[in-house]
Amino acid sequence: MLMPRRVQHRKQHRYRTKGIAWRGSTLAFGDYGIQALEPAWVTAQQIEAARRAITNAVRRGGKVWIRVFPDKPVTKKPAETRMGSGKGNPEYWMDVVKPGRILFELAGVREELALEALTRAIHKLPCRCRIVKRERPGEAAEEEAS
């Protein structure tokens, strides 16, 4: 499971997600990717489930890049606990995802297999996503000509 090795502060505020992602919104490594279309809190468990779905679909071929990292702790108080007495203990880790953020990238596999693998991974994520494909410089000109 993904989580930070060390953190400066064990507990953080739960802030509201505003705006769209400017950084991390384009494909940087692979040929295909998953892009978030709405804001979400993606937990470490959801990231791991999506990663497993991709690796199971592509088997040995291809390379997967995880472009998000769960660095925000989410605290929770025990059940049937009275109000007050401080903030709860960290329960799990998550990442705040803004619309437009690339979550996963994939390279080294056929297009049909990549679309199948990324579709499986999208079903594991808590927000609406779309599959994006890297545009090659010559591809757009070829499509317009035909």
From Swiss-Prot:
GO MF annotation, one: rRNA binding
Gene Ontology terms describing biological process: translation
Pfam families reported for this sequence: Ribosomal_L16
UniProt entry keywords in alphabetical sequence: Ribonucleoprotein, Ribosomal protein, RNA-binding, rRNA-binding, tRNA-binding
UniProt GO cellular component terms: cytosolic large ribosomal subunit
Similarity comment: Belongs to the universal ribosomal protein uL16 family.
Quaternary structure and partners: Part of the 50S ribosomal subunit.
Role of this protein: Binds 23S rRNA and is also seen to make contacts with the A and possibly P site tRNAs.
Name the record gives this protein: Large ribosomal subunit protein uL16
